Every structure is written in structure tokens, then in C-alpha cells.
């Protein structure tokens, strides 16, 4: 699927692509079910939650499962800063795409260098000439490398500071994956973020993933400027000069309570205070 997008390929003004959330941890997949509006979960054209291994997901895609139809996908690698594929979901990528030869090729595509946590690099698998990778690619066109740890030497999560070590890194990784998704894909496969070696509790990870996904799916029902404001308050960087009057007027039109927005506490408050569910169903 290539070429320019027309209005029929847009959802709320953003490119329609199926989001496939995939994880082996049932706690994670159940939390996704709870935190993402049912209107999206029930409409598998836009979102699917897969409880199981990457291999089982790929098997269903290879069989032409109607839920996973599509010709070109990207998959998120939420690993380390050096591109090693030694654990967690990255280990599944390692095994699926060809083991050590694939890891060597993948790291070469990343320049063999350090990539900062919070960065994102798109790797085109069509450039890989490894026989096993070519054989198993099955529509996976890209890997989006989104480091969540420098190295898996110790958990990043500190229960004394859940915002900076949990909510924020997960949101940044999810937002980066969505913002860097190539334009010529039908779908994006994303595992649970930071719930493995990074040690972020699933309830925190899933909340930030759901918030990023809601912002993305809201499309042009929420202006870019207001999205910036919502992110600023979700991550608890309250700075009034970055909250323009136009966004306050927009909040009133969308039914977002400005005072509740300004006092939003990510540890206690529901994300519906920032993005009312009705906004997400306007074009479904």
C-alpha cells in the first residue's frame, strides 16, 4: 500500500492503520481491554488486542485471518539503546526473523551505535537479504526501534517516582512509535512497553499506552496545539504560557474541564478527564 492518502484512508483526519497490541501477559492484555474505549476494540478494522506470543500472531496473519488482513506492517522493538535482541519481546523478534545473523544485520542498520532512550529509528526489512528473514517476513515491512532502557541491567522503575520512571517513559515510547510509523503501512504491532526488564507495573504502562493511543486516534477532533497541552498536563509539567487562549476555548467546546485539566494527577485521575470517550467515537 503506497502513494498519497485520501479522505477514505483517514480516521478522524489521521491515517487509518490497524493497531495490534500483542503481549503474553494476560494482566497487560486485560488492562488494555479496560483502558481503551470499547468502540475501538469492537471495531477490529482499527484495533486488535492479541493475547499470546508473536509467533501465534504471525501464524494467524500468515493464514490470512480476516482480523489481521493487510499487506504491510511495522512492528515496535521496545528494547535497549544498542539494538541487541536478547530478551523480552526483542527475543521473539530475534527468534522469528533469523537469530544471530538477523541481530547483526539489525544492529548494522542502526549504525552500531548508542541510541538514546526516547528516540525512534525505522529499519526497513526489505533491505535484509538474510534468507530466514526473507522467508519469515510475512508482511512485516519495518521495525521501529524505540529504546526503553540503555541496557537491561536493572529495572528503571522507582515506586518513589512513578511519574518519571513509569508514566513518562512509557508514554514517550508509545507516542514515538505512533509518530514514526511509516506512511505506507496497513498496521502497527506494539507489545506492552516497559513491563519486562524495565519493571514498570502493567497498570502504569497500560494507562500511558492508552492515553497516547487515544490522542492519536482522536485525530483532528483535537488540534495539535491542544494535544500538546494535554500531554503537558498528563506528564505534570504545568506551564501556563504554553496553554494558549485558543486551547481553552477548544476545551470548552469538547467538554474538557479546564480546572480539572490543570489539577490532573496521573497517579489518581482517569484519562477520560483529558480525553472524553465521546471524542473518540465521532467518526466510527
Curated annotation (Swiss-Prot):
EC primary class: hydrolase
List the source organism. Saccharomyces cerevisiae (strain ATCC 204508 / S288c) (Baker's yeast)
What is the recorded function of this protein according to its Swiss-Prot or TrEMBL entry? Highly specific phosphatase involved in the metabolism of ADP-ribose 1''-phosphate (Appr1p) which is produced as a consequence of tRNA splicing. + phosphate.
The active site annotation covers: 80, 90, 145
Task: Return one GO MF term.
Answer: hydrolase activity
One BP annotation, GO = tRNA splicing, via endonucleolytic cleavage and ligation
**Coiled coil, from the record:** none
Would the keyword Ribosomal protein turn up in this protein's UniProt record?
A: no
- Could you say which EC number(s) this protein's record lists? 3.1.3.84
Name the keywords, alphabetized.
Answer: Disulfide bond, Hydrolase
Q: Where are the transmembrane segments?
A: none
Q: Which Pfam families match?
A: Macro_2 (PF14519)
The record's CDD domains line, in alphabetical order, gives: Macro_Appr_pase (cd02900)
Q: Which residues bind substrate?
A: 23, 55, 80, 90, 148, 195
Q: How does it assemble?
A: Homodimer.
Catalytic function, reaction form? ADP-alpha-D-ribose 1''-phosphate + H2O = ADP-D-ribose + phosphate
This protein's name: Probable ADP-ribose 1''-phosphate phosphatase YML087W
Q: Where is the Macro domain?
A: 34-230
> Listed disulfide bonds for this chain?
128-136
Amino acid at each position: 500500500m503506497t502513494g498519497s492518502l485520501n479522505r477514505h484512508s483517514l480516521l478522524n483526519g489521521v491515517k487509518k492503520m490497524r493497531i495490534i497490541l500483542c503481549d503474553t501477559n494476560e494482566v497487560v492484555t486485560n488492562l488494555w481491554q479496560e483502558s481503551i474505549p470499547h468502540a475501538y476494540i469492537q471495531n477490529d478494522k482499527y484495533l486488535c488486542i492479541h493475547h499470546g506470543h508473536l509467533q501465534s500472531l504471525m501464524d494467524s496473519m500468515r493464514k490470512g485471518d480476516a482480523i489481521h488482513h493487510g499487506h504491510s506492517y511495522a512492528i515496535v522493538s521496545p528494547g535497549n539503546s544498542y539494538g541487541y535482541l536478547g530478551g523480552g519481546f526483542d527475543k521473539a523478534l530475534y527468534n522469528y526473523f533469523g537469530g544471530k545473523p538477523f541481530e547483526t544485520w539489525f544492529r548494522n542498520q542502526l549504525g552500531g551505535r548508542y541510541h538514546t532512550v526516547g528516540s525512534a529509528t525505522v529499519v526497513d526489512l526489505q533491505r535484509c537479504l538474510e534468507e530466514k528473514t526473507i522467508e519469515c517476513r510475512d508482511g512485516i515491512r519495518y521495525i521501529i526501534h524505540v529504546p526503553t532502557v540503555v541496557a537491561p541491567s536493572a529495572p528503571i522503575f522507582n515506586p518513589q517516582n512513578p511519574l518519571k520512571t513509569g508514566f513518562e517513559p512509557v508514554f514517550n515510547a508509545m507516542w514515538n512509535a505512533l509518530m514514526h510509523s511509516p506512511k505506507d503501512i496497513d498496521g502497527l504491532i506494539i507489545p506492552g512497553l516497559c513491563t519486562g526488564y524495565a519493571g514498570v507495573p502493567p497498570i502504569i504502562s497500560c494507562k500511558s499506552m492508552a492515553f497516547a493511543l487515544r490522542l492519536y486516534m482522536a485525530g483532528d477532533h483535537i488540534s495539535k496545539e491542544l494535544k500538546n497541552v494535554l500531554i503537558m498536563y498528563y506528564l505534570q509539567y504545568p506551564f501556563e504560557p504554553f496553554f494558549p487562549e485558543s486551547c481553552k476555548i477548544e476545551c470548552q467546546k469538547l467538554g474538557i474541564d479546564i480546572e480539572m485539566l490543570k489539577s490532573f494527577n496521573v497517579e489518581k485521575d482517569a484519562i477520560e478527564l483529558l480525553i472524553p470517550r465521546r471524542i473518540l467515537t465521532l467518526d466510527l
